[in-house]
């Protein structure tokens, strides 16, 4: 009887481990505390270099904590979007450096970089991130000013007579 109980307990433990793995959908070999995943993200004139590693959810941008670098809460929420979609909100630490552009462009570059790094860390996230539109680069840039006009599209006032 005791051997049967031990076997059933082992089977139950194994089943619970397997069910947890299926819920997380992260392959076993990818949960590695040593490995780092690198990706670059771009938006407008901003370029972000992102390093992702298994951790406690700490995000550092240009040697500042995320809330210090982006004071607006909406920016922070959009940067956390890939983690919310993949349900890995406190499982990865992010270190990134951003150059160029303004605050909005830098936010988009970091978002794109984090999404690409998450895709590299666990390929099972690819479909989720692709469906959320986080892996595609937003190619919209400022239209150039044309000569003979006031702005890119604004013309001088036209007079018939």
From Swiss-Prot:
InterPro entries per record: Ribosomal_Su5_D2-typ_SF, Ribosomal_uS9, Ribosomal_uS9_bac/plastid, Ribosomal_uS9_CS, Ribsml_uS5_D2-typ_fold_subgr
GO molecular-function term, one example from the UniProt record: structural constituent of ribosome
Keywords linked to the UniProt accession: Ribonucleoprotein, Ribosomal protein
Top-level lineage group: Bacteria
Record's GO cellular component terms: cytosolic small ribosomal subunit
GO BP annotation list: translation
Entry-linked Pfam families: Ribosomal_S9
Family designation: Belongs to the universal ribosomal protein uS9 family.
NCBIfam families: PRK00132.1
UniProt protein name: Small ribosomal subunit protein uS9
Organism the protein comes from: Rickettsia prowazekii (strain Madrid E)
Lineage, top ranks: Bacteria, Pseudomonadati, Pseudomonadota, Alphaproteobacteria, Rickettsiales
Gene symbol of the encoding locus: rpsI
């Amino acid at each position: 009887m005791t051997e049967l109980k031990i076997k059933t307990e082992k089977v139950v433990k194994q089943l619970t481990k397997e069910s947890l793995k299926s819920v997380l959908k992260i392959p076993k070999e990818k949960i590695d505390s040593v490995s780092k995943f690198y990706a670059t993200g771009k938006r407008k004139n901003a370029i972000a270099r992102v390093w992702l590693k298994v951790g406690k959810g700490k995000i550092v941008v240009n040697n500042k904590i995320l809330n210090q670098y982006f004071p607006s809460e909406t920016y922070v929420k959009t940067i956390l979007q890939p983690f919310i979609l993949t349900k890995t909100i406190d499982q990865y630490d992010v270190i990134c450096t951003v150059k160029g552009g303004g605050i909005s462009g830098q936010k988009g570059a970091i978002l794109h970089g984090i999404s690409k790094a998450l895709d590299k860390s666990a390929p099972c996230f690819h479909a989720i991130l692709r469906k959320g539109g986080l892996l595609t680069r937003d190619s919209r840039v400022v239209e150039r000013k044309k000569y003979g006009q006031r702005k890119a599209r604004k013309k001088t006032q036209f007079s018939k007579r």
